């Protein structure tokens, strides 16, 4: 219901929104994205991708876009598998691709629909996953045969566990033939027992760093224990632990609206990923400021890790690391020029950074 209004958008409205997004992407120096789609609106997703593809054919798409087909219910598995195959065939221009199935495995923590291993403290409920491990395994085998990839919305600890279990089952059956790139996105809460399984199973861990201040203004340190207890509430967003375990960690914005695009900024995400705090020095809305750094401080990233997660690691997630993600002879010359050295810039206030020059395939586009 949240997105029902988008089905009424005209083609002109879609193009206007897409062009605004492109302007923002160019300004921030974003040159490659994964679009995670709207749930239950694959028709709208298809129209957006068609708009992007037409821009690409006209030479007006200076961003590489990897789209997806969205699956939310087991009864639509067959339809979705056919849909993602169709998207791959239909969207295959130089900068517009579509070779990924997106699954919404659970909901969100704020309304207690995120799937948990340990129950919520106020209700005693655990939420639920949309699929079980056996269904995930079957989907993976189909995707593997077709040469397609999987991206999964996983907020709660049980949601990512189901994906990990499904990958384990599929790998056990397929062995060295398994080649699906599997990404778990968001990862608000993780059970200790699953942290090292990402690296072991080759599952990509995608986080949304601008949430890592606690994703609620004021005092998230006191807010989240009322939902999931102090131990779990103070060990959320365990990206550094994942990184150190050897897992491939990538970053995202989870932007779903066309506001002022502030939370589309990778520099905002980098700041919060490094500080786990939104304060008066952060280029963000005052209502989102928090009282202190969100625990644990041990999960704060350094600038090198933030840059790698946005560049070569992101390219690996999309399967385009042979052409993108690093400045290497033979690769696309996608790079940015800054007035400041990002490696030595202050962490607090890092969100005010912006490139002075943006190059896409060797040409200045800003």
Which residue stretches match the model-derived regions?
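Short glycine/threonine-rich loop-to-helix capping motif typified by GTGT followed
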Residues: 39-59, 191-197, 201, 263-266, ...
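Divalent metal-binding segments
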Residues: 1-85, 103, 108-159, 176, ...
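Phosphate/diphosphate-binding loops
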Residues: 60-102, 179-192, 197-204, 217-250
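His/Asp/Glu-enriched, well-ordered alpha-helical/loop segment
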Residues: 5, 16, 141-150, 158-182, ...
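Non-cysteine beta-strand/loop elements that form the S-adenosyl-L-methionine
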Residues: 93-113, 202-213, 275
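An acidic- and aromatic-residue-enriched active-site/binding cleft used to recognize and process polar
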Residues: 38, 68-72, 155-157, 187-189, ...
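Short, isolated positions in well-ordered beta-strands
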Residues: 110, 365-366
């Amino acid at each position: 219901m949240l997105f029902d209004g988008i089905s009424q958008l005209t083609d002109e409205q879609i193009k206007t929104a897409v062009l605004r997004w492109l302007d923002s992407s160019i300004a921030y120096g974003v040159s490659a994205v994964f679009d995670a789609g709207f749930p239950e609106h694959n028709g709208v997703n298809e129209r957006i991708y068609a708009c992007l593809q037409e821009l690409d054919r006209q030479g007006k798409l200076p961003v590489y876009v990897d789209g997806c087909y969205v699956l939310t219910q087991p009864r639509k598995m067959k339809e979705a598998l056919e849909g993602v195959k169709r998207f791959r065939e239909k969207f295959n221009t130089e900068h517009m691709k579509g070779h990924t199935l997106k699954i919404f495995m659970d909901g969100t923590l704020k309304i207690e629909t995120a799937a948990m291993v340990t129950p919520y403290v106020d209700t005693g409920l655990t939420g639920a996953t949309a699929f079980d491990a056996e269904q995930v395994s079957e989907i993976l085998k189909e995707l593997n045969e077709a040469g397609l990839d999987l991206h999964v919305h996983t907020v709660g600890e049980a949601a990512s566990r189901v994906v990990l279990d499904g990958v384990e089952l599929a790998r056990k059956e397929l062995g060295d033939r398994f080649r699906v790139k599997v990404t778990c996105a968001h990862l608000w809460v993780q059970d200790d027992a699953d942290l090292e399984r990402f690296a072991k199973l080759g599952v990509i861990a995608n986080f949304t760093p601008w949430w890592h201040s606690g994703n609620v203004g004021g005092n998230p340190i006191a807010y989240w224990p009322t939902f999931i207890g102090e131990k779990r509430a103070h060990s959320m967003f365990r990206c550094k632990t994942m990184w150190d375990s050897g897992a491939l960690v990538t970053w995202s914005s989870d932007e779903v609206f066309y506001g002022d695009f502030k939370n589309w900024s990778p520099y905002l995400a980098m700041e919060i990923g490094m500080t786990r705090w939104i304060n008066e020095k952060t280029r963000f809305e005052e209502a989102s400021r928090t009282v202190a750094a969100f625990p644990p401080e041990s999960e704060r990233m350094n600038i090198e890790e933030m840059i790698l997660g946005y560049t070569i690691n992101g390219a690996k997630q999309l399967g385009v690391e042979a052409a993108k993600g690093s400045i290497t002879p033979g690769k696309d010359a996608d790079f940015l020029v800054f007035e400041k050295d990002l490696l030595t810039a202050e962490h607090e206030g890092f969100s005010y950074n912006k490139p002075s020059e943006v190059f896409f395939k060797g040409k200045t586009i800003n």
